[in-house]
């Protein structure tokens, strides 16, 4: 491994054009003026790299055929499948194949500003003098500045500013709706995860951020214990809470809930208020928490506050995919993608 350390010291020494920028952890980071090779150590940062500077991506932290990504999606470039998969620091994953990663000569590492992983990531890459740029992207409201920050790191400021301003406008519209509804008038929402629907997220968890941003009464209030989340609850607890709306992340659960007698008595089921989270190309609410949540909160607002949400969600979806993912989408494709 010493030869790799020497190699990277030499490469960075030979980088004549560099700049000092501040990451979202408040650290001064020296990065190349022109980034040609980057690596994102977690899926949220990888998706930011993709919408800003896909040509710089050297490797994936998760394979394109993992359950994070929609199977055979047409909204991500197929070239991603050709990139080596080296791992990263996120969820239950703690580490990358450093030999492979170092052979790709990344000039900058985009990493998650999370107390769960920061120290380990910083320590790992300090040994090789590779700059680590931390990005805060836990909450939905972090997204505009996360985009701007990644844009500065990757030398894509203009593109980042265009996306960030669009994100701010979309989020402001949803926030205005949220703020117009008294807290005691907001629907009670249960976020059902897993094939049995008995995993969920704490109200204070970053996994629950889209729901909190839109304005709901959470079915459960607790404290997130791990980066993964997925807090277990039982049927008796759910029946006692009797949510107005259920948002399901798992398609198997969504399909089964309508005929499952255990769930039949719930208000949300009886009133046909169970919704499946859109996931093409990735989950628009969570896992990973990404820029897709900008559209995700619009979709949530359209189903949770339908009287107040006056925009055409299909047009919002198509324009989002065009701007962020550079993909055209018909009205029919938009309807299929978000389940309308």
Report residues per predicted region.
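Sec-dependent N-terminal signal peptides
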Residues: 4-13
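Boundary at the C-terminal end of the N-terminal hydrophobic targeting segment
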Residues: 16-18
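Extracytoplasmic substrate-binding proteins
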Residues: 21, 119-199, 228, 278-340
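Structural recognition of the beta-strand scaffold that forms the well-ordered cores
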Residues: 39-41, 58-61, 108-112, 132-136, ...
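Solvent-exposed loop/turn segments at secondary-structure junctions
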Residues: 43-47, 63-66, 108-109, 114-117, ...
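A short, structured surface patch at a secondary-structure boundary
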Residues: 46-102, 108, 112-114, 219
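Short helices/loops that flank or line small-molecule/ion binding pockets
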Residues: 95-106, 231-242
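Alpha-helical, coiled-coil/dimerization segments enriched in small aliphatic residues
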Residues: 203-229
């Amino acid at each position: 491994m010493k030869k790799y350390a020497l190699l990277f010291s030499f490469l960075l020494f030979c980088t004549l054009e560099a700049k000092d920028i501040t990451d979202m952890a408040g650290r001064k980071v020296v990065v190349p003026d022109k980034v040609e090779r980057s690596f994102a150590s977690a899926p949220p940062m990888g998706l930011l790299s993709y919408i800003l500077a896909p040509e710089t991506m050297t490797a994936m932290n998760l394979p394109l055929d993992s359950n994070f990504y929609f199977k055979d999606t047409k909204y991500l470039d197929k070239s991603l499948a050709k990139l080596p998969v080296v791992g990263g620091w996120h969820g239950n994953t703690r580490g990358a194949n450093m030999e492979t990663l170092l052979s790709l000569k990344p000039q900058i590492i985009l990493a998650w500003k999370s107390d769960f992983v920061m120290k380990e990531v910083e320590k790992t890459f300090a040994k090789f003098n590779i700059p680590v740029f931390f990005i805060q992207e836990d909450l939905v409201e972090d997204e505009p500045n996360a985009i701007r920050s990644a844009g500065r790191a990757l030398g894509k400021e203009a593109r980042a500013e265009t996306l960030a301003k669009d994100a701010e406008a979309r989020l402001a519209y949803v926030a205005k709706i949220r703020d117009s509804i008294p807290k005691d008038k907001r629907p009670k929402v249960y976020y059902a995860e897993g094939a049995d629907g008995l995993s969920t997220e704490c109200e204070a968890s970053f996994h629950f951020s889209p729901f909190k941003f839109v304005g709901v009464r959470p079915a459960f209030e607790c404290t997130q214990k791990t980066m993964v989340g997925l807090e277990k609850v039982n049927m008796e607890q759910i029946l006692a809470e009797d949510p107005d709306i259920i948002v399901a992340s798992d398609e198997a659960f969504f399909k089964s809930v309508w005929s499952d007698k255990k769930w039949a008595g719930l208000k949300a089921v009886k009133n046909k208020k169970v919704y499946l989270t859109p996931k093409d190309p990735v989950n628009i609410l969570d896992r990973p928490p990404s820029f897709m949540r900008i559209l995700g909160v619009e979709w949530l607002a359209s189903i949770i506050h339908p009287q107040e949400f006056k925009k055409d969600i299909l047009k919002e979806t198509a324009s989002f995919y065009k701007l962020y993912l550079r993909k055209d989408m018909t009205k029919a494709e938009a309807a299929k993608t978000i389940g309308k």
